[in-house]
């Protein structure tokens, strides 16, 4: 039996560069940073006081205020991105949609950290009686999927993956396989995160993982630049509608791209420090799954976090996986503008990779003032200006604490 093909028919996102897909994409192509000083809480006693915050977001556009008050902000972002993607795909207008065959898999790397923080404070100040009865369901990671299935009546697979900063990529790759294996015809998949809080920022700052360039937030995230000093935390959600090809064609769906490969690996090395073998394996396995060669790759949306070790390591991994062809590929980090969305990163970056294929454009990697050639960061990072390019095959890399790696391969759709 021939393997079922999976295409992308809907996109939705909430991010520091915009609260809908078109706004975000336009801002990325313009090289506009979404990073600024933290306004969500008083960060004056933390050495990193900058973040990619979602601004001017109104969850009331998607659900009632009563419902919203019972959920953590990461669930808000996930629901919003999912409903955008569902609307973009035109699923609600499809009377013949078999909702038993539609599932949702939207994960988060951390989940309801602000709710946990606020509840802990309430207990300290007033005892256990102060715990909100919606605290648990309002902070569980799988509740994004739960709420979307309830809102839309979908009765297919419903779950939320947790794999640190690889969550979004794993969710999308796993969902594509569910469709290929026949467990669903449509999957709503991606990642969401909302951890800009004292614990979230303070925790990463304690690890010395964050940029401390507080005097110039817009240039703080600078992947592959000699002056990079850590990542900038971000928040938001990115969600794709994945659909079996014949199902999409039968209803005349708009097709952005095809997802043709997914690879996973483990570093088996260190809980936070990277090594090149693990990420290279993920890329190699994804290309093998896609039936493609390294020479077929045109574009890489890199993990590219702006850390001294991570950026150099990913460059080495790409050279290991792609060989000499690595020098002919556009390697781009949209984190230079969004910051690092943690568990949502793989979701928004998969979405941006799909748009790169669909629009034949690479966003820039901004803030490359002096490329760090001495550290081996010597590839084409699409520095500082967007570029029109032939992008038939794009890969999106996501790597997470614990040495968990995921690579997605998207291809220009050709029936």
Give the label of every model feature segment.
Residues 39, 183-229, 262-274, 304-311, ...:
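Acyl-CoA/ACP chain-elongation machinery
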Residues 1-67, 246-258, 351-365, 411-415:
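ACP-dependent fatty acid/polyketide chain-elongation machinery
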Residues 5-9, 36, 215-290, 299, ...:
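Condensing-enzyme catalytic core mediating Claisen C-C bond formation in acyl metabolism
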Residues 1-3, 37-80, 101, 111-174, ...:
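Conserved catalytic cysteine-centered active-site region
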Residues 10, 28, 82, 104, ...:
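Conserved small-residue
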Residues 126-132, 170-173, 177, 194-250, ...:
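Glycine-/small-residue-rich "gating" segment that lines the acyl/pantetheine channel
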Residues 85-98, 248-255, 283-299, 321-325:
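Phosphate/pyrophosphate-binding loops at sites that engage ATP/ADP/AMP, CoA/4′-phosphopantetheine
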Residues 78-89, 144, 171, 243-245, ...:
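Short, well-ordered amphipathic alpha-helical segments that serve as non-catalytic structural scaffolds
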């Amino acid at each position: 039996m021939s393997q079922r093909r999976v295409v992308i028919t809907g996109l939705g996102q909430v991010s520091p560069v915009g609260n809908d897909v078109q706004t975000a994409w336009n801002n990325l192509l313009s090289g506009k940073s979404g990073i600024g000083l933290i306004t969500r809480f008083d960060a004056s006693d933390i050495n990193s006081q900058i973040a990619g915050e979602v601004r001017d977001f109104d969850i009331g556009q998607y659900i009632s205020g009563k419902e919203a008050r019972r959920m953590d902000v990461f669930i808000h972002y996930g629901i919003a991105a999912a409903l955008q993607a569902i609307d973009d795909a035109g699923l609600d207008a499809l009377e013949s949609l078999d909702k038993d065959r539609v599932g949702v898999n939207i994960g988060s790397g951390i989940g309801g950290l602000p709710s946990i923080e606020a509840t802990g404070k309430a207990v300290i100040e007033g005892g256990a009686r102060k715990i909100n009865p919606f605290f648990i369901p309002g902070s569980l990671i799988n509740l994004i999927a739960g709420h979307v299935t309830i809102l839309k009546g979908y009765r297919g697979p419903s779950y939320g993956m947790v794999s640190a900063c690889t969550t979004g990529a794993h969710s999308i790759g796993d969902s594509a396989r569910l469709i290929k294996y026949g467990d669903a015809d449509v999957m709503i998949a991606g990642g969401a995160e909302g951890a800009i809080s004292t614990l979230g920022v303070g925790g990463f700052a304690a690890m010395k993982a964050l940029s401390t360039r507080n005097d110039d937030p817009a240039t703080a995230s600078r992947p592959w630049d000699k002056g990079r000093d850590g990542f900038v935390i971000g928040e938001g959600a990115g969600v794709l509608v994945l659909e079996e090809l014949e199902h999409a064609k039968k209803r005349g769906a708009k097709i952005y791209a095809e997802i043709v490969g997914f690879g996973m690996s483990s570093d088996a090395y260190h809980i936070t420090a990277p090594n090149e073998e693990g990420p290279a394996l993920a890329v190699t396995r994804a290309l093998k799954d896609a039936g493609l060669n390294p020479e077929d790759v045109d574009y890489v949306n890199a993990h590219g976090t702006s850390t001294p070790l991570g950026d150099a390591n990913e460059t080495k991994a790409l050279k290991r996986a792609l060989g000499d062809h690595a020098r002919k590929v556009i390697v781009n980090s949209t984190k230079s503008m969004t910051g690092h969305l943690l568990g949502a990163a793989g979701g928004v970056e998969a979405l941006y990779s799909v748009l790169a294929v669909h629009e034949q454009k690479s966003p820039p990697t901004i803030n490359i003032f002096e490329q760090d050639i001495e550290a081996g960061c010597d590839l084409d990072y699409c520095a500082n200006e967007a570029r029109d390019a032939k992008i038939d095959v794009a890969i999106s890399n996501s790597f997470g604490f614990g040495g968990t790696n995921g690579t997605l391969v998207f291809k220009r759709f050709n029936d």
